[in-house]
């Protein structure tokens, strides 16, 4: 998993509350268990004018020019600004996969659905909770300033606006450690690989009848 330390990026404003996981990545694209291939279908029903299907050539599909991610000023955005209860609905890890592959490193909102919130950390995305007032002000500034960027410093737990104002956020210490060091569940397990090997050797020696090749 890619580590998250500090990031500066263009902000894309998704001014909708209660965005659910089926809107983030529609159900017809969930047939794959690979972590790649979902970026082109992020927010598929909003980005395109037709009905998306797996494995089609998205470059030939008609775009919804009114959708925020299709606006020229938000091309290359890596910070998503959203409203409350982002990521609600059914549990699907494909949602953070799609956001990550599109290029987003962080999502800022007043609140998140619990399962999506947890899945984001496990996949290298940083969900940041700010107050309604802070989020409202960010929406206003993004709208008024093309190319608006934020700098996110995970170690300092701070979001810095272009005008220099710093917005602080809270994060669980363990989740912070994992993101700073790029550790997903597998990475955490591999940190104890020596202890695991020692246990397996001891277990094999003490109960050899459990192993066919013993």
Curated annotation (Swiss-Prot):
Domain of life: Bacteria
EC number: 4.2.1.33
SUPFAM superfamilies: LeuD/IlvD-like
Keyword Lyase: yes
Biological process terms in GO annotation: L-leucine biosynthetic process
GO molecular function, one term: 3-isopropylmalate dehydratase activity
Protein function: Catalyzes the isomerization between 2-isopropylmalate and 3-isopropylmalate, via the formation of 2-isopropylmaleate.
Protein name per Swiss-Prot or TrEMBL: 3-isopropylmalate dehydratase small subunit
Lineage, broadest ranks: Bacteria, Pseudomonadati, Pseudomonadota, Gammaproteobacteria, Pseudomonadales
